[in-house]
Amino acid sequence: MSHSVKIYDTCIGCTHCVRACPTDVLEMIPWDGCKAKQIASAPRTEDCVGCKRCESACPTDFLSVRVYLGPETTRSMALSY
């Protein structure tokens, strides 16, 4: 799948998204831009299945982590309707 996972600087370093990901796409890395001194990172996007559990787990109302589904997923979702 070709999904894109973007982490934004509104991340508060809580690790909820990392713990919610069933395919271990996300990890925390050091970052001085927030109180927790860490930010989510997505080094393994090729393993993303597009479930968006990371988005649902994010306490910043989906403003910090976003999953953009690839074209093949969008097409298959349209066929299921």
From Swiss-Prot:
Membrane topology according to the record: Peripheral membrane protein
Cofactor(s) this protein cannot do without: [4Fe-4S] cluster
PROSITE patterns linked: 4FE4S_FER_1, 4FE4S_FER_2
The entry's keywords: 4Fe-4S, Chloroplast, Electron transport, Iron, Iron-sulfur, Membrane, Metal-binding, Oxidoreductase, Photosynthesis, Photosystem I, Plastid, Repeat, Thylakoid, Transport
Signal peptide interval: none
Catalytic reactions on record: reduced [plastocyanin] + hnu + oxidized [2Fe-2S]-[ferredoxin] = oxidized [plastocyanin] + reduced [2Fe-2S]-[ferredoxin]
Residues holding [4Fe-4S] cluster 2: 21, 48, 51, 54
Cofactor: record remark: Binds 2 [4Fe-4S] clusters. Cluster 2 is most probably the spectroscopically characterized electron acceptor FA and cluster 1 is most probably FB.
NCBIfam families (UniProt xref): PS_I_psaC
Role of this protein: Apoprotein for the two 4Fe-4S centers FA and FB of photosystem I (PSI); essential for photochemical activity. FB is the terminal electron acceptor of PSI, donating electrons to ferredoxin. The C-terminus interacts with PsaA/B/D and helps assemble the protein into the PSI complex. Required for binding of PsaD and PsaE to PSI. PSI is a plastocyanin-ferredoxin oxidoreductase, converting photonic excitation into a charge separation, which transfers an electron from the donor P700 chlorophyll pair to the spectroscopically characterized acceptors A0, A1, FX, FA and FB in turn.
UniProt protein name: Photosystem I iron-sulfur center
